């Protein structure tokens, strides 16, 4: 299980804190054995306090090549606050890694539950999604493949250019009337 993000962005702190305090206990209750890799820059004092409640957490720190860590991993995006497109999801998709996220985590990217990813908003549902995904390698491959296909369809540069030009044409036509 892998999380990508640094401590200097508060939504990442909240996400890792929520996973360690709320989701990890749900995983343990189910007898699920895991390692929670956190990629990014974090202060050791904060990491130690989280490891006290989540000994499965391992700080990887900064890495040059995310694909090396993400490929074959289940990426966790337990984001509950913030806005904007989640680069960690784009990193997962480009690495062909399946991922579990929250509704907030996938906000801004038109990916669908059970089609391109698993979406869960409560700690128990998030843990269940992690366990489900870990147990089903075919599901991992299907979600990763579908996510890449969907993003290529949605964000095709040529189609985006054509949509932008259509908007410009409409604006120009409205201004001339």
Regions found by a protein language model. Name each.
Residues 88-92, 98-102:
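Short hydrophobic beta-strand element within catalytic cores of glycosyltransferases
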Residues 117-124, 132-137:
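Conserved acidic donor-binding segment of nucleotide-sugar-dependent glycosyltransferases
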Residues 103-114, 118-119:
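Short acidic/histidine- and often glycine-rich active-site loop of Leloir-type glycosyltransferases
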Residues 56, 70-84, 95-98:
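Acidic donor-binding loop of glycosyltransferase active sites
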Residues 138-169:
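A charged, aromatic-enriched C-terminal amphipathic alpha-helix characteristic of glycosyltransferases
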Residues 81-84, 89, 106:
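Active-site donor-sugar recognition loop in glycosyltransferases
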Residues 1-71:
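Conserved catalytic-core segment of nucleotide-activated headgroup transferases in glycan assembly
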Residues 8-11, 84, 118, 152:
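Glycosyltransferase donor-binding loop in the core domain
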């Amino acid at each position: 299980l892998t999380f990508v993000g640094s401590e200097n962005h508060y939504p990442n702190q909240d996400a890792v804190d929520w996973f360690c305090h709320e989701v990890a206990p749900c995983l343990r209750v189910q007898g699920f054995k895991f390692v929670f890799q956190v990629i990014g820059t974090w202060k050791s004092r904060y990491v130690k306090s989280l490891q006290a409640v989540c000994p499965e957490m391992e700080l990887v720190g900064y890495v040059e090549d995310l694909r090396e860590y993400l490929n074959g991993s289940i990426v966790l995006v337990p984001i509950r606050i913030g806005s904007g497109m989640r680069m960690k999801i784009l990193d997962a998709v480009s690495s062909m890694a399946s991922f579990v996220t929250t509704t907030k985590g996938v906000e801004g990217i038109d990916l669908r539950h059970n089609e391109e990813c698993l979406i869960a908003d409560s700690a128990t549902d998030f843990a269940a999604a992690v366990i489900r995904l870990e147990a089903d390698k075919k599901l991992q491959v299907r979600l990763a493949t579908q996510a890449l296909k969907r993003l290529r369809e949605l964000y095709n540069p040529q189609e985006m250019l054509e949509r932008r030009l259509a908007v410009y044409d409409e604006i120009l036509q409205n201004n001339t009337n």
